[in-house]
Swiss-Prot record:
Pfam families: CoA_transf_3 (PF02515). This is Bile acid CoA-transferase BaiF. GO terms for molecular function: bile-acid-CoA transferase activity; choloyl-CoA hydrolase activity. It is an enzyme of class 2 (transferase). It comes from Clostridium scindens (strain JCM 10418 / VPI 12708). The lineage of its organism: Bacteria, Bacillati, Bacillota, Clostridia, Lachnospirales. The keyword Lipid metabolism applies. It comes from the Bacteria. The active site is at 168 (nucleophile). Induction: Induced by bile acids. Its EC number is 2.8.3.25.
Length: 426
């Protein structure tokens, strides 16, 4: 257990205070990433509605370094606890159906009466404004992928959902910078700010130029699977031994180095298809098809290791497709600490992804695993001025709640679904 005052000082965001009342991935990921950078993050949940991600493998990674507070904001006492934390926080982030907190009587204006300078971040599937029939709709990852149009760009004959949870995670990353931008605005203006993050818009924003291409010129690119829909020599290729490798032979200097390898003339040496300064071409054109055929002939005559070695020797971007075991065993992954180990209150000693974005002067840390449901209630409430008698009363009234490890294991059947915990129980 830990309280607000127990949070260690480290990282680029030491001292930043965040209240996160979101659930699943799209909202909480933002707070989780900032907690790794040293922000003090309290994950706030309702006593009867634990975060849906609890009990899944991703929870220990997305919620490490956080504190857990559980209270019923629909009750008078629980609402007071929530507003006390609003008063404490620099940023409040929530994820729910559009307008959910307005319906609870906790509009932005009410929040700013309590803390005039707080940065408010609303995360939802469809946004807080727009067509009323959309705003209150529920959304999961696949909904965001489908509604954004992004899913239609992938696959071959049928649209393809990208795993795992691309829409959720892109929205979470968008939420992360929205939180910081909103907070910086409060610093620059001295006034609170609120930002509306819609899951589908976060994913639509990374469609590159596809929407401009279609909305402006009526051109809709076909689904091409692992082949790039536009650029030639920017795809996965099957080699002589049946193994697959990605090769990206685009850009003027790369084409100069790479074309002789696959039997094409160096740009600028007389072939009209490849003039001086040639950087690449559209895959669906005659020139693009000529380039593709040359590459396919080359890889059909060489093993994947041979292709990889030659491409790397000439500084041509390439990469064989790694399985997870390849990631774990790769020397570069190991050297950067991309994989690390830590202790988690729910799952015990685990191995997973380490800290990304390596800060030189203010490094990030993992100082604790993801807390159990309500694990830090008592310490947080004491930091807010509650005494033991009052805290006991809140528990008796069901306004606050918590699960110990045994309750957690039974509720989520962890001894059945998590292999290393099953062995532990046996």
């Amino acid at each position: 257990m830990a309280g607000i005052k127990d949070f260690p000082k480290f990282g680029a965001l030491a001292g930043l205070k965040i209240l996160d009342s979101g659930s699943n991935i799209a909202g909480p990921l933002g707070g989780g990433l900032l907690a790794e950078c040293g922000a003090t993050v309290i994950h706030f949940e309702g006593p009867k509605k634990p975060d849906n991600q609890r009990g899944w493998y991703g929870y220990p990674q997305n919620h490490r370094n956080q504190l857990s507070m559980v209270a019923d904001i629909k009750s008078e006492e629980g609402r007071k606890i929530f507003l006390d934390l609003i008063k404490w926080a620099d940023i409040w982030v929530e994820s729910s159906k559009g307008g959910q907190y307005d319906r609870l009587g906790l509009s932005d204006e009410v929040i700013w009466e309590v803390n005039p300078k707080i940065a408010i971040v609303h995360v939802s599937g469809y946004g807080q404004t727009g067509d009323p029939s959309y705003v209150t709709r529920a959304s999961y990852d696949a909904v965001g992928q489908a509604f954004s149009g992004y899913m239609s760009l992938n696959g071959t004959t049928e649209a393809l959902k990208i795993n795992p949870y691309l829409s959720d995670f892109v929205c979470g990353l968008t939420t992360c910078w929205a939180m910081l931008a909103c907070y910086v605005s409060t610093i620059l203006t001295g006034k609170g700010e609120s930002v509306d993050v819609a899951q589908y818009e976060a994913l639509a924003r990374i469609m590159d130029g596809r929407m401009i291409q279609y909305a402006t010129d009526g051109v809709k690119m076909p689904r091409t699977g692992n082949k790039d829909a536009q650029a030639a020599l920017f795809s996965f290729y099957t080699c002589k031994d049946g193994r697959t490798i990605f090769i990206g032979m685009t850009g003027a200097e790369v084409c100069k180095r790479g074309f002789p390898i696959i039997g094409l003339p160096v740009p600028g040496t007389g072939d009209p298809d490849f003039p001086e300064g040639f950087t690449g071409w559209m895959i669906y054109t005659p020139v693009g098809q000529r380039m593709e055929k040359a590459m396919e002939k080359y890889v059909s005559e060489h093993t994947m290791e041979e292709v990889e070695a030659e491409m790397q020797a000439h500084q041509i971007p390439c990469q064989r497709v790694y399985e997870l075991e390849d990631c774990l065993n790769d020397p570069h992954w190991k050297a950067r600490g991309t994989i690390t180990e830590w202790d988690d209150p729910m799952m015990g000693h685990i191995t997973g992804l380490g800290l990304i974005n390596k800060f030189k002067r203010n490094p990030s840390e993992i100082w604790r695993g993801a807390p159990l449901f309500g694990m830090d209630n008592r310490d947080i409430l004491k930091d807010l001025g509650y005494d033991d008698a009052k805290i006991d009363e809140l528990y008796e009234q069901g306004i606050v709640n918590e699960f110990d490890l045994d309750t957690t294991i039974k509720r989520y059947r962890l001894d059945e679904v998590i292999p290393h915990m099953r062995k532990k129980e046996e």
